[in-house]
């Protein structure tokens, strides 16, 4: 285990995922609080009826740990579902609501949600949502909203293999927010710095991760110019939403933090 220390970046708010420590939720979070001020609780697999979710007893323990450590939460909602059919959409919505209700005790600032028609993506770019799919998803979001402390606490995440404007109609038609996943934009060979000003009014939080054969790897794999192209404008505008370093090992988290510090040094040297 590395010597614990809080990882912070001047002028930006960063956090880690609950997966940087390979353990069950409670022992993992006991370690995570030493490294970050904000933790993404990843509840990725709910099962058919929520049987795969964290237990209420574990949530109570996590609430106590976080209160003692002074850390904040965001929650990544289950991803093992989607809106391909009316029935799959109904099950997925029920599990999303279960996860929100279960974690309300933690008082998260954000719940992050995937909006997909098929939760097992193929290799090809997804088409835009059809009118029927859009209506199905909007009905689901209407059911989810009453379970939130405020509608903007739900952030819809952009995904790889989906058009960048895939979520535009949903965001404009609802009071919900965006989770800007920068790594997913890089994975498609696109430039997230071009999307930043377009999406800025709706961004609740960000996911940031590098690419090395696949995504969700350390930022130190990214060319300095690529990382600077998105981070330097954030410092320019005093970007305030949380940036979760969405990596799944402690080494990748610490190396990503170091890469951000080096980017900040380059930023300072130019100003």
Q: Residue spans of the language-model regions?
A:
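N-terminal pre-domain/capping segments
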Residues: 1-98, 270-271
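Histidine-acidic metal/acid-base catalytic patches
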Residues: 2-13, 27-31, 82-85, 93, ...
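Active-site beta-loop-alpha junctions enriched in small/polar residues
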Residues: 17-21, 42-46, 78-82, 116-118, ...
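Hydrophobic faces of well-ordered beta-strands that scaffold small-molecule active sites
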Residues: 12-18, 37-41, 73-77, 111-113, ...
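A short acidic, helix-capping loop that chelates divalent metal ions and anchors anionic groups
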Residues: 47-50, 81-86, 119-125, 213-218
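Active-site acidic/histidine proton-transfer and metal-coordination neighborhood
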Residues: 84-177, 240, 268-271
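Structured helix-beta-strand junction loops
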Residues: 35, 69, 150-151, 174, ...
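Alpha-helix-loop-beta-strand connector modules within alpha/beta enzyme cores
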Residues: 59-76, 135-147, 228-234
């Amino acid at each position: 285990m590395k010597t614990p220390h809080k990882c912070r970046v001047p002028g930006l708010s960063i956090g880690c995922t609950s997966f940087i420590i390979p353990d069950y939720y409670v022992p993992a979070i006991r370690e995570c609080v030493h490294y970050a001020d904000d933790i993404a609780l990843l509840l990725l697999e709910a099962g058919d009826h929520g049987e795969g979710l964290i237990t209420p007893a574990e949530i109570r323990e996590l609430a106590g740990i976080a209160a003692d450590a002074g850390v904040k939460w965001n929650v990544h909602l289950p991803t093992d579902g989607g809106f391909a059919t009316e029935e799959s959409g109904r099950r997925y919505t029920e599990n999303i609501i279960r996860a929100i209700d279960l974690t309300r005790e933690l008082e998260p600032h954000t719940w992050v949600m995937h909006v997909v028609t098929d939760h097992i993506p193929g290799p090809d770019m997804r088409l835009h949502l059809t009118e029927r799919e859009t209506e199905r998803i909007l009905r689901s979001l209407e059911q989810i909203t009453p379970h939130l402390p405020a509608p903007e606490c739900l952030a819809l995440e952009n995904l790889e293999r989906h058009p960048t404007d895939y979520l535009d109609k949903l965001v404009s038609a609802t009071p919900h927010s965006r989770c800007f996943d920068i790594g997913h934009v890089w994975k498609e060979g696109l430039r997230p710095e071009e999307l930043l000003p377009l999406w800025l009014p709706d961004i609740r939080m960000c996911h940031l991760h590098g690419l090395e054969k696949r995504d969700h790897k350390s930022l130190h794999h990214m060319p300095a110019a690529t990382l600077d192209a998105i981070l330097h404008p954030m410092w320019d505008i005093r970007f305030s939403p949380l940036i979760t370093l969405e990596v799944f090992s402690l080494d990748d988290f610490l190396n990503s933090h170091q890469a951000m510090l080096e980017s900040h040094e380059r930023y300072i040297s130019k100003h």
